[in-house]
Amino acid sequence: MDFDTVHNRFGTHCVKWDMMQPLYGVPAETGLAMWVADMEFRPPHCVQAALEKMLAHGIYGYYGDDAEYLDAVRWWMQTRHGWSVDRDQIFTTHGLVNGTAMCIDTFTRPGDGVVLTTPVYHAFSRIIKAAGRQVVECPLSIVDGHYEMDFAAWDARMTGTERMFILCSPHNPGGRVWTAEELHGVAAFCQRHDLILVSDEIHHDLVMPGQRHLPMPIAAPQIADRLVMMTATTKTFNIAGAHSGNVIIADPALRARFADRMMAMGLSPNSFGLHMATAAYSPEGAAWVDDLVQYIDGNRQVFDAGINAIPGLRSMPLQATYLAWVDFGAIGMPQADVIDRVQKTAQIATNHGTAFGMGGESFLRFNLGCPRATVVEAVARMQAAFADLQ
């Protein structure tokens, strides 16, 4: 597989590159786009071939007969994650941000609290607030350099108005693969406080060697009556523009409520996205993912070695995802000055930690889903930008 080729995405209506200068002041011609969580790699050939077949046919009508897609989802979940899913449990959404919004709309009411384990994926908070719900932040604790859950502290934050818990598993931006014990703890917490659990597992295929992701239905089957699962091909295969995702619900009562809401919204599948996803969930796609994970792990090692060599900087150990979470807190520099050095001196666009909620204030998130040469260049620029610390 070729992950080393640098592809010019500037001028292709690409958020990551075409919006970098307007939002961050980093010019696309000389800057490095390491913010938006999509990768710089072309998807596997099977995905390209599926699109070429559609283009050759030349008629782009409404999508129907999703049996092949549903079987591909079921095959992937069983073979890659040991998770058995029935066809009638799978709903197709326009990506998982849309899926999250649908879950909030279906299972909560305006004014209800939605629990987030912060710092966490920034879109969650935005959607919750836009829907007229309340964000309830349950901060993660840093123990031995990585995030852990403090259920006793979280219990103390509950007021009785909370109705939903959104879990990011694996965790973005901290890169944690939650253990069976931690997942059991989340399940018990949701039972204790009568919360619907929405488990966003979009990064579940991007787990580093030596780590194992556990789907929540396997880790805690006892909460099937309050569990909503979310998965997608978009992160795994770098096809975010396809806007497709899965909401998977085992409980019939929850499933009926979600189906009614989807009908009321008039949603229908994206034909291009489902053709791409069907092709991706295949043996060829699986082989590509295996190679991708090895490559990202190599990027992680290069990045961590270079960043951690800068006194006071620390890249949190990455167990999953291609997103490095770097803490600048120990250097004693105002975060505005840190950002100024990264964006103006190093000319790197990253995600600011404040967007991820409580606990993210001293962090920046770097996207390592790129050619190795880009990672090497980013490290060199960071070392030069913070040379006075050495």
PLM ranges: what are they?
Residues 1-61:
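N-terminal "arm"/small-domain region of PLP-dependent enzymes with the aminotransferase-like
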Residues 1-12, 67-69, 73, 130-136, ...:
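Conserved long hydrophobic alpha-helices within structured protein cores
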Residues 26-32, 36-53, 84-86, 91-390:
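PLP-dependent class I/II
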Residues 54, 61-94:
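Conserved N-terminal alpha-helix of the aminotransferase class I/II PLP-enzyme fold
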